[in-house]
Amino acid sequence: TGFGQAPYYLADEALYDYADKNYKNRKDKESRQKMAILDRMVKDGNNVGKPYVEDRVHFLAGMTPEEIATLGYDCYMRSYKGKMYPEMKALISNLEEYGFEVWILTASPEFLYQRFVASELGIPVTHVLGVKGVVKNGVMSDEIIMPIPQDDGKAQVIPTYIKAVPLIVGGNSRGDMD
């Protein structure tokens, strides 16, 4: 765990804040669809299950990668800035000093986390991997690229994208057990 996300995950807070500003109490088709996704997420209640993390991407469908990155960055700056654990920042710095290549895997939407995580930890944005959605004509679609970095998918992301055997890994939820 790189930073304290309490009482909510940043991904959820960002989506709910965005929905409050852009979709809540509106009657158009898109607003109803987006609110239905959030209702389904709340009803599911398993915020580390694959359907839940897939629905985060479904909610972001129609936004550009830049809009999603800005949404994540702004939420981080507003609610989570200063909550990166100094011990984790020191560990990452020490690993890099000794020649380790550091990667961050998250079950949150990749574009939502890349900018602020890379900025705060000083790692390349390409080393922050999350749930990937297909970008078509410059906007996120609701199609998801496998593997999903959750449950057994997190272990599959390593050979698929990193292509190296890790020397050390860490996790913060039951979705990281595999």
Language-model regions, residue ranges each:
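A metal-dependent, Asp-based hydrolase signature
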Residues: 8-82, 86
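C-terminal cap/substrate-recognition subdomain and adjoining C-terminal extension
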Residues: 63-103, 107-178
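Asp-based phosphoryl-transfer active-site loop
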Residues: 1-8
